[in-house]
């Protein structure tokens, strides 16, 4: 990743987004960009943020960064898997794809008609499948993004967030689709 070739002034990168440990990140600052310090203390982290650097987390971040494949390969892999997942989901009655077609392929948001997100999360987790109902930073709150898309409360309340990474396989996505189909069949029987 070469932010200086991308025309950006500032870029933040979170370790946990590339399978590294939580608590570490990186900040690219274009030469000549002025930052205003908001917290004061030591001289760590370029005088931008005081406090002891989490050395083990930083080392883990470095190892994770070294392990990721070329960005283009990663993007192609994720795009192919997202397209495969969406094509499979479109064959299931009661599934709505909420993500725009031109969204980055790493997150796919869907709604499963008639099954609240929390019920679906529990059902899938009992099968060893882990998805979420929203972003980690807004846990417990309805998605601001889905609200901004003017989606109905029913769609928002049944939304699932599916993550795809360089380690995701077609077999895992097939198992996810089987889990969603199974959940829908189970809920129909219970009604």
Locations of regions flagged by a protein language model:
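Pyridoxal 5′-phosphate
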Residues: 1-191
């Amino acid at each position: 990743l070469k932010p200086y070739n991308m025309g950006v002034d500032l870029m933040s990168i979170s370790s946990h987004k590339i399978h590294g440990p939580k608590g570490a990140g990186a900040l690219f600052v274009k030469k000549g960009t002025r930052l205003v310090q908001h917290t004061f203390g030591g001289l760590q982290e370029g005088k931008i943020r005081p406090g002891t650097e989490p050395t083990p987390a930083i080392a883990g971040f470095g190892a994770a960064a070294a392990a990721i494949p070329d960005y283009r390969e990663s993007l192609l892999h994720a795009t192919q898997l997202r397209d495969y997942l969406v094509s499979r989901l479109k064959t299931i009655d009661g599934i709505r794809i909420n993500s725009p077609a031109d969204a980055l392929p790493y997150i796919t948001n869907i709604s499963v008609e008639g099954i609240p997100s929390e019920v679906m999360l529990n059902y899938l987790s009992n099968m060893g499948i882990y998805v979420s109902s929203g972003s980690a930073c807004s846990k417990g709150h309805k998605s601001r993004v889905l609200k901004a898309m003017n989606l109905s409360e029913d769609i928002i309340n049944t939304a699932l967030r599916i993550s795809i990474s360089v380690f995701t396989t077609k077999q895992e996505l097939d198992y996810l689709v089987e889990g969603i189909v199974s959940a829908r069949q189970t809920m129909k029987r219970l009604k």
